[in-house]
Every structure is written in structure tokens, then in C-alpha cells.
Design a protein with these regions (language model features):
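Membrane-helix boundary/coupling elements in multi-pass transport proteins
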Residues: 77, 100-114, 218, 222-231, ...
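Extracellular loop-to-transmembrane helix junctions
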Residues: 14, 37-136, 245-250, 254, ...
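TM-loop-TM module centered on a large, flexible mid-protein loop between adjacent transmembrane helices
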Residues: 83-86, 90, 122, 241-305, ...
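Helix-loop-helix connectors at the membrane interface of multi-pass transporters/channels
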Residues: 1-6, 83-86, 112-133, 165, ...
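Membrane-interface "cap" regions at the ends of multi-pass membrane proteins
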Residues: 1-40, 44-49, 61-66, 77-78, ...
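C-terminal membrane-solvent junction of multi-pass transporters and transport-like membrane proteins
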Residues: 158, 330-340, 380-431
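Helix-loop-helix junctions that connect adjacent transmembrane segments
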Residues: 8-13, 51, 125-128, 160-293, ...
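Membrane-interface loop-to-helix entry segments
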Residues: 117, 130-188, 215-219, 242-247, ...
Length: 457
């Protein structure tokens, strides 16, 4: 009992994440499984100009990270960047944001654990999906419960697998172009990109639709904004991690996409097959499909690991700021002897674990798919709120003149918000996303009104 009180009073997490951990996690945060599996689909939408879509979207995500980075630099003790919404926009919007963000990340975790089972069944099709999900969730849950430095180490190696796979793709592309490698599609050459180039080869609407697909490939880029309070020397580490985001986007996304389109003319690419598998098979790697399956499996495991970390910290924050009977009963506002929010992590993991059983219930699984799609739109609302909070921060007494400042914030901040609104609007233009967009709009309005009412003066 005394030990428990001690940990509750201490309320400080261990700074166990090093510069090495954070820098590599920042890279991993910009690279999702979509690059490995969905690049063919995104390229088929708008051809070589997809690189421009990635650069534009990545640029705005970088600006958002500069806003988050500026506020975290001023106050690196915060467990989450969501706290700045509470501080500068009020308890109502803070309540809306922290609950919405926590639930959205939980649904991302559910989607990732479902994907993990699918990737494992590539090798072991007879293994039951629910068992695979429970095993992975248990293992990664334990990783999060032991110590934050163990979490950081596991994330480091998960990220390295993705990085090596992309470097291998870029190196393969350079080799094939320089040697004029012959494939069933012709010679590998940069001409495959420039030949009959058109900015909108499939029409302007497909170019616009590409933005939403690319935007969601960048989800969780803000993850390093949750690790600051557990990072050693955050005022040195955080600016470096944020500053290098544009270079990572250009190199990893731009390099990989250009390599793919140099080897295979973009009109010949399959929208459903992984171009990574296709390219590696062209150079004689017979087990390319198994290799890329391993890469996306570790990528999904990395995302699940990060969601357990993030949901645990956010539920811990909720338990501190807006405790209810349930959160008090499970003592979600306490830290373990390893200085991690053990009970909050376990509660989040249990909720994510429901995915293992939801997916076998047809009616429920359809509703789950709609809710998951809706959470994507809610993410955009939170991104907009953090940009508004940044504007308020700049006018507050907390503003740190010699801090890590967002450049030209007076016009770049509103421009970033307009971009997020544009992406949200595109969700209503496509049949596959319109139901999720409506669901997210209903949540934003209904829960937003409730949150403001709950904390009305």
C-alpha cells in the first residue's frame, strides 16, 4: 500500500529513451505499411506525380510537428502533446481531444493486431486468427510493462527492419538503372518516369483523392510527441528528430517511389500487388513475397507496440485530469515500480484485444469497420486543434522566445489547418470513405458539444 502511494505521488516517468531510440522511432513514424503494400495503388491513381503528393503532404505534417515540437521544447515534462490543447483551448476541448485521440489510437491498435494475424497466416494458414492476436498482444504488452528502455530497444530494431528494406529497394533501383537492367517491362531507366509525363494522367480528381491515401500513410507521425517526458535530454533530442523529418520523407518515400517507377513503367504496375515484391522478384529473389511479408509483419507489430505505449500514457493522463469511477477502480493514474503506467496500459491492451473476437462476429465486424474508418477523420480534427493551440501558445505568457520556433507561423500555421480541412473534405468525395467521414463528423459535433457542456462555466 505504501509502495503504491509512493508511485502515485511520484507521478514522474523514467527518462529511459535515448537519442538513438527517438531518432529511429521518428523515422519509423513517417514510414507505414502502406509504402510496402499500397504503393502500387497510390501510384496507379496519379502516376509519377504521386511523389509530389507525398512531398506536399509530408511538408504539412512536418509543419504540424514543428508546432508540437515548439510547445514540447518549452515544456518537455508533458506526457502528451494533447495537454497543450487543454492548456490553451480549455478543459472542454482538452477532454474532447484526449478521449478522441485515445479511442482513435485504440482502433488503430485493433486494425494492426488484425493485420498481424493476416501476415502470420501467410506462413501458417491453419493457425486461428484470435490466437495469433492474443499471443502478439501479450508479448508486446509485456514489453511495455517491463521498462520504457525495453520498449525503446524493441522499437529501434522494428524500425531498423523497415529502414533496411527501403534502403535495399533504393539500392536495387540505382543498380538496375545504372546497368540498364532488362525486365519483362523493358529496360530500367529514369525515362520510365519522364516518358509522356502528365501531372494529372488520370484526371484531377484522382490526384486530389491521392492526398487522403497519402495523409493516412503518415498517421502516428506525431508519436514522438508522446515520448518527450521519458526521453533523456529532450531539448536536444526533440529538435533533431523533428528537423530531419523532411529529409526522411524525401529520401525514404521519394527514393523508394522513384526507384519503383524507374524499374517498372507506372502504367504497368499492379494496383493490388506490392511493388516491393515485384521488384525483388525481378532481380531473382524467389522468396521476395515472404521477405516483404516479414517486413510488414514487423511494421504492424511496431505500430501495435507504439499504440500500446501511446494509449497507456493517454489513459494515464485522462485518469489524472478527468477521473471517473472505472479509472479510479483500476487505479489508472498510478505508476508501477518500473515507472510505467501499468494499469492504464493493461486496460488499453484489453480493449485492443477485443479485436480478436470482434472480427469473427459478422454484424459486429461491419460496425467495427465503420468506427475504425470514422476514427481517421477524428484524427484530422485533433491535428487542427493542436495547430489552434499553437497559435494560442504564441500569444501566451508561456511563449519561449529562444525556443525551437516554428518558422513563419503566422501564415504557415493557418495554411496547415486549411490543408487538414481539405483532406477531411476529400473523405466525402469517395464512396469507400464517405461513411467513415460522416461518422467522424457526427462524433466531432456530438462529442464536441458534450465536452464543452461538461466543462461549461
Amino acid at each position: 500500500m505504501n509502495s503504491e502511494k509512493k508511485h502515485k505521488k511520484k507521478s514522474k516517468m523514467e527518462r529511459g529513451l535515448t537519442n538513438r531510440h527517438v531518432q529511429v522511432m521518428a523515422i519509423a513514424g513517417t514510414i507505414g505499411t502502406g509504402l510496402f503494400l499500397g504503393a502500387g495503388r497510390s501510384i496507379s491513381l496519379t502516376g509519377p506525380s504521386i511523389v509530389l503528393v507525398y512531398m506536399i503532404t509530408g511538408g504539412f505534417m512536418y509543419l504540424m510537428m514543428r508546432a508540437i515540437g515548439e510547445m514540447l521544447y518549452q515544456d518537455p515534462e508533458q506526457h502528451t502533446f494533447i495537454n497543450f490543447i487543454t492548456r490553451y483551448l480549455g478543459k472542454g476541448w482538452g477532454y474532447f481531444s484526449v478521449w478522441s485521440y485515445w479511442l482513435s489510437v485504440v482502433f488503430i491498435g485493433m486494425a494492426e493486431i488484425t493485420a498481424i494475424a493476416h501476415y502470420v497466416q501467410f506462413w501458417f494458414p491453419s493457425w486461428p486468427s484470435w490466437l495469433i492476436q492474443v499471443v502478439f498482444l501479450t508479448i508486446l504488452g509485456l514489453v511495455n510493462l517491463i521498462a520504457v528502455k525495453i520498449f525503446g530497444e524493441v522499437e529501434f530494431w522494428f524500425a531498423m527492419i523497415k529502414i533496411v528494406a527501403i534502403l535495399a529497394m533504393i539500392a536495387t533501383g540505382i543498380f538496375m538503372v545504372l546497368t540498364g537492367f532488362e525486365t519483362p517491362y523493358g529496360s530500367a531507366s529514369l525515362v520510365n518516369i519522364s516518358k509522356q509525363f502528365s501531372l494529372f494522367p488520370n484526371g484531377g480528381m484522382n490526384f486530389v483523392m491521392a492526398f487522403q491515401m497519402v495523409f493516412f500513410a503518415y498517421l502516428m507521425i506525431e508519436f514522438i510527441g508522446v515520448t518527450t517526458s521519458e526521453t533523456k535530454d529532450p531539448r536536444k533530442v526533440l529538435p533533431k528528430a523533428v528537423k530531419e523529418i523532411p529529409l526522411r520523407i524525401i529520401f525514404f518515400y521519394g527514393g523508394a517511389l522513384l526507384a519503383i517507377m524507374s524499374i517498372i513503367p507506372w502504367r504497368e504496375l499492379s494496383a493490388t500487388d506490392s511493388p516491393f515484391v515485384t521488384v525483388f522478384e525481378l532481380v531473382g529473389l524467389k522468396w521476395a513475397a515472404a521477405l516483404i511479408n516479414f517486413v510488414v509483419l514487423t511494421s504492424a507489430a511496431s505500430a501495435l507496440n507504439s499504440t500500446l505505449y501511446s494509449t497507456g500514457r493517454h489513459l494515464y493522463q485522462i485518469a489524472h485530469d478527468s477521473p471517473n469511477r472505472f479509472l479510479k477502480a483500476i487505479k489508472a493514474d498510478t505508476l508501477s515500480r518500473h515507472n510505467v503506467p501499468q494499469n492504464a496500459i493493461i486496460a488499453s491492451a484489453v480493449l485492443i484485444g477485443f479485436a480478436a473476437f470482434i472480427n469473427v462476429l459478422p454484424g459486429v465486424s461491419d460496425a467495427f469497420a465503420l468506427i475504425t474508418a470514422s476514427s481517421s477523420g477524428v484524427y484530422i480534427a485533433i491535428y487542427i486543434l493542436i495547430m489552434v493551440a499553437h497559435l494560442k501558445y504564441r500569444k501566451s505568457k508561456d511563449f519561449m522566445v529562444d525556443g525551437y520556433l516554428m518558422p513563419q507561423y503566422r501564415w504557415l500555421n493557418p495554411l496547415t489547418m486549411l490543408f487538414f480541412i481539405f483532406v477531411f473534405g476529400t473523405l466525402f468525395l469517395q464512396e469507400s470513405t464517405v461513411m467513415g467521414a460522416r461518422g467522424s463528423a457526427i462524433w466531432i459535433v456530438a462529442f464536441g458539444i458534450y465536452s464543452q457542456w461538461k466543462f461549461r462555466k
